[in-house]
Amino acid sequence: MTDKKYFKQVKPFRVPTTDGKLIEEHLGLATTRTPAYSIAHMIAPPHWSEPHQQPEFDEITIVIRGRKMAEVDGEEIILQAGETLLVKSGARVKYSNPFDEETEYWSVCVPAFDINTVNREDE
């Protein structure tokens, strides 16, 4: 980032994935070396899932289109377009899209998403 009091992101970092999910980090460790927060735009394909994790950061999910499931400490929560979920640091969570349509959403992590602090389980 520069000495300016603003930053305009024109080319988010596309995170390489092998599961068909689109992840574009707009602000965070990968793009701006910002450790305090990260924000990413994501599109999860139908029937997508990731392993359980117990992150050391809060994560806010804002669903734009479709539906998304979050299993938080054993409780299943279904989010629809226009809904928001806050999962607090230390919760055991698994995100998925078990539905037949794509899910588009934004994710905000505080502090920033870090592969070393997401604590994904082997499944």
Explain the meaning of each model-derived region.
Residues M1-A36, R120-E123:
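A short, N-terminal "cap"/entry segment at the start of jelly-roll beta-barrel domains
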Residues I23-E25, I39-P55:
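Conserved short histidine dyad/triad with adjacent acidic residue
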Residues G28-L29, S49-P55, S96-P98, V118:
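Short histidine-centered beta-strand/loop micro-motifs
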Residues R33, S89-I115:
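Ligand-binding loop in jelly-roll beta-barrel domains
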Residues W48-E50, M69, L85, S89-Y95:
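Histidine-centered metal-chelating micro-motifs
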Residues E56-K68, D73:
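Glycine- and acidic-residue-biased ligand/ion/polar-headgroup-sensing regions
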Residues R67-M69, E76, R92, E102:
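Structural motif
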Residues G74-S89:
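Short acidic-glycine-tyrosine-enriched beta hairpin
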